[in-house]
């Protein structure tokens, strides 16, 4: 017999859908009438089920019909005698009377169970594939174990050690102090139990994050089936899984992926609330709060999302039952209390956070310029070129080679999904996807575009891509008359295969996507170096280790993660031993990256250098040198000569306007001295090793000056200025200090009156740095 023309074949990854439940009770059903168009000679199999209000199956009846060869339509009447009798469920509490138009409230947990039960084996298999591509070789990709991952477990261990108090002695704190700022919260708390069970482990720390990353995969698949009426919930799971930005970050312990996971759950339960489940607002609010506390850029993303959702569905919200509204408001107030507590205890911390991030909002520029910067960054976060193609904005460790943040092959499907969302804008589910897209870059724009701050985009992108692909599949079914089962299985295998291809590519080619393995790049080596130190110490307990920290951020945090505090490991750069005589003995083993090893060789300050071992970088080159050495016999003489040389000023003549100025200055390793007088704020000088920078400017004829302005960097600075006035025996002195800032800024000295100046002597010091050091200066302007 030919296939039915109007009834699609079964989806191999989805259980058979029940007929919609009648609104009346089972006892009132006397007849069911179906009008179906059939190809001539088609046999029709009908399954009629009765369900409880929460979706539980009570009874089922199957019937078979056949159309004549000449028939193209048939009307089927199923008499009451053939309608399956509905076994009555256990007596339940009488329904609450509701006002006309008020929302109904089906049991939330029962609905969730039904949704999961009907998701199908394809959905379950897709989740297995998702987890497999996250857990396989978890420590090998990303190749680095970053300090921002290690700090989660280190803070958790300190929290347990200190009686569930943070470093400020706050019991069960809202936020934990991370180096310079309070910015970690939920990501620390979720590591406590794993730490107590398994201790410090890269697999465990990352594995916890991976398990939470399943949340958007589950919620995305269920949302795709439940709110977008798709028969392919696995499409959303596999589409999310192959988004490169998510593939990379969901395999790390960065708090950004955790915040995105909670954000996805917030969206899911909000959409469930929009399907006449008012009590779904409770978990929606809880997951929104978890995302809010997990990652600071999520805070503005959530605010923007919540405001737009409120306005978008205002008429629906006004029908919210009073008791649900009151409980939701109470729950929200309860979840705000930890933030209020934190704000009262640390009122300046939000400002400090923006300072640490270098936000332009704190710069001394007009408000209109700040707004322009914000919307410029925001629009850049919506630019498809940023998302689908390689870029130079993000640092290499946050990029998967040439993949782009969103898979370029998904671009046409996502674009078609956006079209469908706009077309179906009257549907709350589609509007929510567009709102999530609009909100995603809002948090990043406060500081600057970066994938960790805009990672929220992967959630709507994956669902939009799944919508576009599902629509394309339906088009293929109509155009090619291909069997649905074959197309579904083929698409599933293609997406699943690409998941494992991406995993294999990351584990092999990914090791050389970037060959910058140092501080400015991948920061490779934490697990490898510290594991070797532990192994070395077990065989040679008398050895003392001096490890350079210059190859990674927060090397002290990494050391605490991998090595017990009792082990003899000291963090120090080779420069500590090059610039001053620092004692060490023959039991000292230096561990240096290539650049520091080369400086030690070239310095002529050490002898008897012996490399005992090397640890290679992923490209095969030596990445770390384990060596022993000692100072040369005349080291004190060499260091004394270098200190004296730093005080010797270089002399040069600089033309400023029509005058030639004689300038004496400290040795430079960046920029000519003329950069200070070219009226260009983009050019600068930097001292080779002197701190403070010393400058003497001699005018050929006296200049009438009222003050002096230096364009300095963001570091804390101290200025000592001596002004020689024509006819005076001694120079007038001025002293000024500026604290650290977020951007380069002017440092101005007002003389208080007009002076006839013959020379200026400037000493500019980085307040918090010692010598040798680097001092930066952009411009000198007198008035």
Task: Name every feature range the model reports, one short phrase each.
Residues 175, 403, 484-574, 717-720:
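Membrane-proximal, lumen/periplasm-facing interface regions of secretory-pathway glyco-
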Residues 145, 245-256:
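Short acidic/glycine- and proline-prone juxtamembrane loop motifs at membrane-interface regions
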Residues 250, 300, 405-413, 430-476, ...:
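Hydrophobic/aromatic-rich transmembrane helices and adjacent perimembrane loops
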Residues 152-165, 197, 273, 299-415, ...:
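Transmembrane-lumen/periplasm boundary regions of multi-pass, lipid-linked membrane glycan transferases
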Residues 678-734, 743-783:
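Aromatic, loop-rich ligand-recognition surfaces of beta-strand-rich domains
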